A protein has these predicted regions:
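Short S/T/G/P-rich N-terminal loop/turn motif that feeds into the first structured element of a domain
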Residues: 1-202
Length: 202
């Protein structure tokens, strides 16, 4: 099992690009074909997630160490043309995030959950998240990543990995989770997307 947990090796910035596609296989071929363009733009890692209920709804994670080059890539006409030709439906939603911790499993595709919520204080929330590690492990959560919103650092985006979506759904619906999140200072109800993750590439 390969995980990355050295914070010094984290990329400095990342984008989560969400959109629907007409046909995933067509889109995947175009995505694979643009690998050189991503590398040329300074993107060091890419990970595609497909919504568990709607496999043509995608969330694409792109990591970089150069915010200017990443933004230029995301706003380029070449990318817009590639996405259009790949069957992307409508304009993508782009969320810029700052990676904080990466303990994801990268040696095989896994089910995932993308959890988004605001917190009152990130440090307090992180202590509570770390304190819940045994519960995650017992629930079959084998990998995770923590990110903060670039414009709003109290917006937290957590990526959880397990062998099955059912394990993630069971963890998210456990009765005590609401109390844990309330004590951690989570504001409002979290937004949770269950996904199937693909291979990690660049």
């Amino acid at each position: 099992m390969h995980t990355q947990n050295d914070s010094s090796g984290l990329p400095s910035i990342a984008a989560v690009v969400s959109h629907d596609v007409t046909d995933f296989d067509t889109w995947q071929r175009a995505f694979d074909g643009s690998s050189a363009a991503r590398k040329g733009a300074g993107i060091v890692a890419a990970h595609v997630n497909r919504d568990a209920a709607n496999p043509n709804q995608l969330s694409v994670y792109l990591a970089s160490n150069d915010a200017e080059r990443l933004n230029a890539f995301l706003s380029s006409r070449d990318l817009m043309g590639t996405m259009r030709d790949a069957g992307v439906k409508g304009p993508p939603a782009i969320a810029m995030i700052t990676p904080v911790e990466d303990q994801t499993v990268k040696d095989r595709p896994l089910a995932g959950a993308i959890v988004r919520h605001e917190v009152q204080d990130f440090a307090i929330w992180k202590r509570a998240f770390d304190g819940d590690s045994d519960a995650r492990r017992k629930a079959g959560i084998i990998g995770h990543a923590v990110n903060r919103g670039l414009k709003n650092p109290n917006l937290v985006v957590v990526y959880l990995q397990a062998e099955s979506v059912d394990s993630l759904r069971a963890f998210a619906s456990r009765p005590e989770l609401k109390a844990v999140m309330t004590a951690a200072g989570v504001i409002g109800a979290p937004d949770i997307s269950f996904v199937t993750g693909g291979a990690w590439t660049n």
